[in-house]
Structure formats: structure tokens, C-alpha cells
């Protein structure tokens, strides 16, 4: 809601369900016949409205509500394309067991096919107003990342604490993280050179005018990408992780998206993914 309110954007709330009857044992149906009742979209739409209304008080434009029957990731992407949306927001409410794996599967399929920014939001651990004081932005030095970083700055910085579209105040931290693979970590002389070069590139990544908005902090670590991203995010108490999903080849895309999926599943703060292709 914070993003929608700041930009006075149109919010569309989408709920996807499957009307097909699952395989339920006959004795279970006999004990709970309501399981066989057909789903009524109008009633479900009313339920969605009632569920969401308490969270919509900050909106300047009335929200639109949609209920669709079908495959969850397919319907999400199809509606996003139909409505020409700028951002998809998904809640990662399932934190354990099979539900967590299923949620990861849905999120990964949306990331793979949406080709637009996706914000994955975990269960709320605080009720205070949302501010972005510490943003973690992993950088892989891909040729498309300057555009992704520009997008991050234009979209996220207006929501940082003490910053508004009309009043820029410095203070928020933008942590630029580059993770060096384990191979270099095991070769100290190579890691030292790579670390030095990476630090210089990170320092040059943020445009000069953006430094009036935030405090860029370059950081280089060694290890597996998703593990290091989650570790640094937890260490800093990050309010947001921003990742570019890129790679020209199919293998590169799969590798980076698998990293992104693991970060989404393990993060305790929202994760914004940007399609930088």
C-alpha cells in the first residue's frame, strides 16, 4: 500500500482460485459435505473485499478487485499483461513445509514469465509504518545492471525515511553487494585483486546526484550468492532486497533465477526483482 499511496497509483487486488474439485475421499465428503459445494465467485469477491478493506485507508484512488478461476501463476501474469501493470506484489505467506515450497514454485513461475518488476513480501513482523532505511542491492556487474540500478533509485528512494518526491534528505543506506564465488576465495591472491576491482566498480555504480538522496555503501564478500545475500541482509537488518534477473543465455537465467528464488524463500524482508533483459 505504501508504494501505491506514494505514487497515487491504481491498485488492483487479484485472487486466483481453482473451481475444479480436488480428489477428496468419500468418507471426508460425507463428514463435511460443504467441501463439495461449488465456489461462488461473487461471494468470494465479497470476501476478498472484506479482507483487504482495513489495509486500504491510505489509498487516494479506489482499489479494483478481481477474482479469477485458473492456474495461479498463469492468471497472475495474464492479468498483469492485460492491465499493463507496472509492478506485481505477491505475499509469501507460507514459511514452512510443503506450502513454502509451493509458494516458491508460484513465485519462480511468475518471475520467469512476467518480464516486469515483482515485489515478494513475507509475513509482517512489525506494524510500524513502512520506511526504507537500509536497502540491499546485490550487483553482479552485468551490462544491464546500470539500468536496473537506475530503476531502483527512481522507484525506491522516494519511500526512504525522511524522503519525499518533493524533499530529498540524505541518510538512507544503499548497500551495494558483490559476491565473489568460492573459487576465488580459495585463491587469496586472486580474491584480493578481484575484491579491489569490485569495490572500485561498486563505488562508480551510483550516479552522483543520487548521493544527495542516500549513503551508498559498497561491500564485497565471498561465498554462495544466495547464502551471502541472506546473511548480509540479516546482519544489516535490511528493509528491502533488490535483485536484477538477467542473463542472455537460458542457463544463466536459470542459475540467477534459482538464486533469486532461494533469496525470496529465505528473506525476512520484501524482495524486489527486476527483469533487466
Stretch-by-stretch model annotation:
Residues 31-46, 190-200:
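A short acidic, glycine-rich active-site loop
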Residues 28-32, 82-83, 106-107, 136-138, ...:
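Short, hinge-like loop/turn segments at secondary-structure boundaries
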Residues 75, 148-151, 201, 228:
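Well-ordered alpha-helical segments embedded in enzymatic catalytic cores
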Residues 6, 77-128, 231-277:
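Gly/Ser-rich helix-loop-strand patches that form or flank binding pockets
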Residues 1, 53, 108, 150, ...:
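Active-site phosphate/pyrophosphate- and oxyanion-stabilizing loops and adjacent acidic/basic residues
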Residues 1-33, 133-193, 208-211, 215-219, ...:
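Small/aliphatic-rich secondary-structure junction motif
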Residues 2-8, 12, 18-21, 36-39, ...:
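Structural beta-alpha unit
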